[in-house]
Protein backbone atom coordinates (compact mmCIF):
# COMPACT_ATOMS: atom_id res chain seq x y z
CA UNK A 1 0.00 0.00 0.00
CA UNK A 2 1.33 3.44 -0.97
CA UNK A 3 2.06 5.82 1.88
CA UNK A 4 -0.39 8.68 1.78
CA UNK A 5 -0.28 12.19 3.23
CA UNK A 6 -2.95 14.87 3.46
CA UNK A 7 -4.06 18.17 4.89
CA UNK A 8 -7.38 18.17 6.74
CA UNK A 9 -9.47 21.31 7.08
CA UNK A 10 -12.91 22.84 6.56
CA UNK A 11 -12.82 24.50 4.11
CA UNK A 12 -9.54 23.32 2.59
CA UNK A 13 -9.89 23.62 -1.20
CA UNK A 14 -7.83 26.83 -1.09
CA UNK A 15 -4.87 25.12 0.60
CA UNK A 16 -1.45 25.42 -1.00
CA UNK A 17 -0.11 22.47 1.03
CA UNK A 18 -0.45 19.84 -1.75
CA UNK A 19 1.52 22.07 -4.11
CA UNK A 20 4.15 22.79 -1.46
CA UNK A 21 4.73 19.13 -0.59
CA UNK A 22 4.81 18.11 -4.25
CA UNK A 23 7.56 20.69 -4.81
CA UNK A 24 9.47 19.52 -1.74
CA UNK A 25 9.20 15.94 -3.01
CA UNK A 26 10.63 16.88 -6.41
CA UNK A 27 13.49 18.77 -4.75
CA UNK A 28 14.42 15.76 -2.65
CA UNK A 29 13.64 13.02 -5.17
CA UNK A 30 10.84 11.60 -3.03
CA UNK A 31 7.51 10.50 -4.50
CA UNK A 32 4.80 12.19 -2.42
CA UNK A 33 1.08 11.34 -2.48
CA UNK A 34 -0.42 14.35 -0.69
CA UNK A 35 -3.95 15.66 -1.05
CA UNK A 36 -6.44 18.01 0.59
CA UNK A 37 -9.35 16.44 2.47
CA UNK A 38 -12.32 18.56 3.52
CA UNK A 39 -14.05 17.27 6.65
CA UNK A 40 -16.68 19.02 8.74
CA UNK A 41 -15.83 19.01 12.47
CA UNK A 42 -18.27 16.22 13.27
CA UNK A 43 -16.69 14.03 10.56
CA UNK A 44 -13.04 14.64 11.43
CA UNK A 45 -12.34 11.69 13.73
CA UNK A 46 -13.98 9.10 11.48
CA UNK A 47 -12.35 10.63 8.41
CA UNK A 48 -8.92 10.52 10.00
CA UNK A 49 -9.27 6.84 10.84
CA UNK A 50 -10.49 6.07 7.32
CA UNK A 51 -7.43 7.89 6.00
CA UNK A 52 -5.16 5.75 8.19
CA UNK A 53 -6.87 2.56 7.03
CA UNK A 54 -6.24 3.61 3.42
CA UNK A 55 -2.49 4.04 3.89
CA UNK A 56 -2.37 7.43 5.56
CA UNK A 57 0.87 7.82 7.51
CA UNK A 58 1.14 11.58 7.92
CA UNK A 59 -1.13 14.59 7.87
CA UNK A 60 -1.26 18.31 8.36
CA UNK A 61 -4.26 19.73 10.17
CA UNK A 62 -5.65 23.21 9.71
CA UNK A 63 -8.68 25.12 10.98
CA UNK A 64 -10.96 24.06 12.60
CA UNK A 65 -9.41 20.68 13.52
CA UNK A 66 -6.17 21.50 15.39
CA UNK A 67 -7.54 20.95 18.87
CA UNK A 68 -9.46 17.83 17.82
CA UNK A 69 -6.23 16.46 16.35
CA UNK A 70 -4.54 17.05 19.70
CA UNK A 71 -7.17 14.90 21.41
CA UNK A 72 -6.62 11.85 19.16
CA UNK A 73 -2.85 11.63 19.70
CA UNK A 74 -1.39 8.96 21.95
CA UNK A 75 1.99 10.72 22.08
CA UNK A 76 2.83 14.40 21.71
CA UNK A 77 5.88 16.60 21.46
CA UNK A 78 6.49 18.94 24.38
CA UNK A 79 5.59 21.99 22.28
CA UNK A 80 2.32 20.41 21.13
CA UNK A 81 1.43 19.53 24.70
CA UNK A 82 2.12 23.09 25.78
CA UNK A 83 0.07 24.53 22.93
CA UNK A 84 -2.83 22.11 23.33
CA UNK A 85 -2.94 22.08 19.53
CA UNK A 86 -1.62 19.83 16.77
CA UNK A 87 -1.03 20.59 13.09
CA UNK A 88 1.25 17.65 12.20
CA UNK A 89 0.33 13.99 12.61
CA UNK A 90 2.63 10.99 12.18
CA UNK A 91 1.29 7.44 12.23
CA UNK A 92 3.23 5.13 14.55
CA UNK A 93 1.84 1.62 14.38
CA UNK A 94 -1.88 2.00 14.96
CA UNK A 95 -1.64 5.31 16.81
CA UNK A 96 -1.05 8.97 16.06
CA UNK A 97 1.89 11.07 17.23
CA UNK A 98 1.24 14.82 17.25
CA UNK A 99 3.36 17.94 16.89
CA UNK A 100 2.78 21.61 16.21
CA UNK A 101 5.10 23.19 13.64
CA UNK A 102 3.17 26.43 13.12
CA UNK A 103 5.05 28.32 15.82
CA UNK A 104 8.54 27.44 14.66
CA UNK A 105 7.38 28.07 11.09
CA UNK A 106 6.20 31.56 11.97
CA UNK A 107 9.37 32.39 13.88
CA UNK A 108 11.55 31.17 10.99
CA UNK A 109 9.57 33.27 8.53
CA UNK A 110 9.71 36.43 10.62
CA UNK A 111 13.36 36.15 11.63
CA UNK A 112 15.01 34.51 8.61
CA UNK A 113 12.88 35.75 5.71
CA UNK A 114 11.79 39.15 7.03
CA UNK A 115 14.79 39.91 9.21
CA UNK A 116 12.87 40.70 12.39
CA UNK A 117 14.43 40.45 15.83
CA UNK A 118 11.59 39.33 18.08
CA UNK A 119 13.50 39.85 21.30
CA UNK A 120 12.15 42.59 23.52
CA UNK A 121 8.95 43.12 21.56
CA UNK A 122 5.55 43.65 23.12
CA UNK A 123 3.02 41.52 21.25
CA UNK A 124 -0.76 41.52 20.81
CA UNK A 125 -2.31 38.19 19.77
CA UNK A 126 -5.85 38.48 18.41
CA UNK A 127 -7.72 35.20 18.81
CA UNK A 128 -7.38 32.21 21.13
CA UNK A 129 -8.27 29.20 18.99
CA UNK A 130 -6.05 26.42 17.67
CA UNK A 131 -4.00 28.72 15.44
CA UNK A 132 -3.29 31.14 18.28
CA UNK A 133 -2.37 28.33 20.65
CA UNK A 134 0.00 26.84 18.08
CA UNK A 135 2.14 29.98 17.69
CA UNK A 136 2.10 31.54 21.17
CA UNK A 137 4.69 29.24 22.82
CA UNK A 138 7.23 29.65 20.02
CA UNK A 139 6.90 33.44 20.07
CA UNK A 140 7.49 33.50 23.81
CA UNK A 141 10.50 31.25 23.34
CA UNK A 142 11.80 33.63 20.66
CA UNK A 143 12.09 36.40 23.24
CA UNK A 144 8.80 38.29 23.22
CA UNK A 145 8.80 40.49 26.33
CA UNK A 146 5.04 40.55 26.88
CA UNK A 147 2.23 38.60 25.20
CA UNK A 148 -1.27 40.08 25.45
CA UNK A 149 -4.13 37.91 24.18
CA UNK A 150 -7.58 39.24 23.34
CA UNK A 151 -10.52 37.16 22.18
CA UNK A 152 -14.23 37.85 21.83
CA UNK A 153 -14.81 34.89 24.17
CA UNK A 154 -12.59 35.88 27.11
CA UNK A 155 -12.63 32.42 28.67
CA UNK A 156 -10.74 31.08 25.67
CA UNK A 157 -8.05 33.73 26.10
CA UNK A 158 -7.75 32.83 29.78
CA UNK A 159 -7.34 29.14 28.90
CA UNK A 160 -4.57 29.95 26.42
CA UNK A 161 -2.71 32.07 28.96
CA UNK A 162 -3.01 29.38 31.63
CA UNK A 163 -1.53 26.84 29.20
CA UNK A 164 1.52 29.05 28.59
CA UNK A 165 2.50 28.88 32.25
CA UNK A 166 4.21 32.29 32.21
CA UNK A 167 1.96 34.64 34.20
CA UNK A 168 4.58 37.35 34.29
CA UNK A 169 4.87 37.58 30.51
CA UNK A 170 1.56 36.33 29.11
CA UNK A 171 -1.75 37.97 30.02
CA UNK A 172 -5.31 38.07 28.71
CA UNK A 173 -7.43 41.18 28.31
CA UNK A 174 -11.04 41.88 27.32
CA UNK A 175 -11.82 42.76 23.71
CA UNK A 176 -13.60 45.88 24.94
CA UNK A 177 -10.33 47.10 26.47
CA UNK A 178 -8.37 47.23 23.20
CA UNK A 179 -8.20 51.03 23.29
CA UNK A 180 -6.56 50.94 26.70
CA UNK A 181 -3.81 48.38 26.03
CA UNK A 182 -1.15 50.76 24.75
CA UNK A 183 0.94 50.05 21.66
CA UNK A 184 2.72 46.96 20.38
CA UNK A 185 5.75 46.14 18.24
CA UNK A 186 4.05 42.97 16.98
CA UNK A 187 0.34 42.41 16.28
CA UNK A 188 -0.72 38.94 15.12
CA UNK A 189 -4.18 38.11 13.81
CA UNK A 190 -4.90 34.44 14.55
CA UNK A 191 -8.64 34.58 13.81
CA UNK A 192 -10.40 33.31 10.69
CA UNK A 193 -12.60 36.40 10.47
CA UNK A 194 -10.99 37.45 7.20
CA UNK A 195 -12.55 34.48 5.43
CA UNK A 196 -15.78 36.47 5.52
CA UNK A 197 -15.29 38.72 2.49
CA UNK A 198 -17.54 41.40 3.98
CA UNK A 199 -15.53 41.73 7.18
CA UNK A 200 -13.78 44.99 7.99
CA UNK A 201 -11.24 45.12 10.79
CA UNK A 202 -11.82 48.14 13.00
CA UNK A 203 -9.04 48.08 15.56
CA UNK A 204 -7.82 51.12 17.49
CA UNK A 205 -4.95 52.99 15.85
CA UNK A 206 -3.50 53.41 19.33
CA UNK A 207 -2.26 49.80 19.11
CA UNK A 208 0.37 50.83 16.54
CA UNK A 209 3.73 52.49 17.08
CA UNK A 210 6.57 53.35 14.71
CA UNK A 211 8.02 49.82 14.95
CA UNK A 212 4.85 47.75 14.59
CA UNK A 213 4.86 44.65 12.42
CA UNK A 214 1.38 43.29 11.67
CA UNK A 215 1.07 39.58 10.86
CA UNK A 216 -1.96 37.65 9.65
CA UNK A 217 -1.65 33.89 10.01
CA UNK A 218 -3.99 33.58 7.02
CA UNK A 219 -2.84 34.14 3.46
CA UNK A 220 -4.48 35.16 0.19
CA UNK A 221 -7.96 36.66 0.31
CA UNK A 222 -8.43 35.69 3.96
CA UNK A 223 -5.60 38.06 4.94
CA UNK A 224 -6.75 41.07 2.93
CA UNK A 225 -9.01 42.72 5.52
CA UNK A 226 -6.58 42.66 8.44
CA UNK A 227 -3.57 43.70 6.38
CA UNK A 228 -5.63 46.52 4.82
CA UNK A 229 -6.23 47.83 8.34
CA UNK A 230 -2.53 47.43 9.14
CA UNK A 231 -1.47 49.45 6.11
CA UNK A 232 -4.05 52.14 6.83
CA UNK A 233 -2.69 52.28 10.39
CA UNK A 234 0.81 52.77 8.91
CA UNK A 235 2.38 49.66 10.42
CA UNK A 236 6.04 49.47 9.49
CA UNK A 237 5.74 45.90 8.14
CA UNK A 238 2.81 43.74 7.04
CA UNK A 239 3.24 39.98 6.70
CA UNK A 240 0.73 37.34 5.66
CA UNK A 241 0.81 33.65 6.59
CA UNK A 242 2.29 32.28 3.38
CA UNK A 243 5.84 32.15 4.70
CA UNK A 244 4.71 30.46 7.90
CA UNK A 245 2.79 27.93 5.81
CA UNK A 246 5.89 27.06 3.79
CA UNK A 247 8.19 26.88 6.82
CA UNK A 248 5.84 24.74 8.91
CA UNK A 249 5.40 22.46 5.91
CA UNK A 250 9.16 21.99 5.73
CA UNK A 251 9.19 20.97 9.39
CA UNK A 252 6.40 18.45 8.75
CA UNK A 253 8.26 17.11 5.71
CA UNK A 254 11.34 16.63 7.87
CA UNK A 255 9.39 14.53 10.36
CA UNK A 256 7.82 12.36 7.66
CA UNK A 257 10.79 11.93 5.32
CA UNK A 258 13.91 12.64 7.39
CA UNK A 259 15.14 15.65 5.41
CA UNK A 260 14.29 19.35 5.65
CA UNK A 261 13.80 20.85 2.18
CA UNK A 262 14.96 24.27 1.08
CA UNK A 263 11.99 26.67 1.19
CA UNK A 264 12.82 29.77 -0.87
CA UNK A 265 11.96 28.20 -4.23
CA UNK A 266 8.43 27.18 -3.30
CA UNK A 267 7.82 30.42 -1.39
CA UNK A 268 8.78 32.58 -4.36
CA UNK A 269 6.83 30.37 -6.75
CA UNK A 270 3.65 30.72 -4.70
CA UNK A 271 4.16 34.43 -4.15
CA UNK A 272 4.68 35.16 -7.83
CA UNK A 273 2.03 32.75 -9.05
CA UNK A 274 -0.96 34.55 -7.53
CA UNK A 275 -2.11 38.13 -8.00
CA UNK A 276 -3.57 38.10 -4.48
CA UNK A 277 -0.44 36.70 -2.85
CA UNK A 278 1.90 38.90 -4.90
CA UNK A 279 0.75 41.99 -3.05
CA UNK A 280 1.06 40.72 0.50
CA UNK A 281 4.69 41.37 1.39
Swiss-Prot record:
GO terms for biological process: amino acid biosynthetic process; aromatic amino acid family biosynthetic process; chorismate biosynthetic process; shikimate metabolic process. Pfam families: SDH_C, Shikimate_DH, Shikimate_dh_N. It comes from the Bacteria. GO terms for molecular function: NADP binding; shikimate 3-dehydrogenase (NADP+) activity. Shikimate binds at residues 15-17, 62, 87, 102, 219. Pathway: Metabolic intermediate biosynthesis; chorismate biosynthesis; chorismate from D-erythrose 4-phosphate and phosphoenolpyruvate: step 4/7. It catalyses: shikimate + NADP(+) = 3-dehydroshikimate + NADPH + H(+). CDD domains: NAD_bind_Shikimate_DH. GO terms for cellular component: cytosol. Its EC number is 1.1.1.25. Involved in the biosynthesis of the chorismate, which leads to the biosynthesis of aromatic amino acids. Catalyzes the reversible NADPH linked reduction of 3-dehydroshikimate (DHSA) to yield shikimate (SA). Belongs to the shikimate dehydrogenase family. PANTHER family: BIFUNCTIONAL 3-DEHYDROQUINATE DEHYDRATASE_SHIKIMATE DEHYDROGENASE, CHLOROPLASTIC, SHIKIMATE DEHYDROGENASE. Homodimer. This is Shikimate dehydrogenase (NADP(+)).
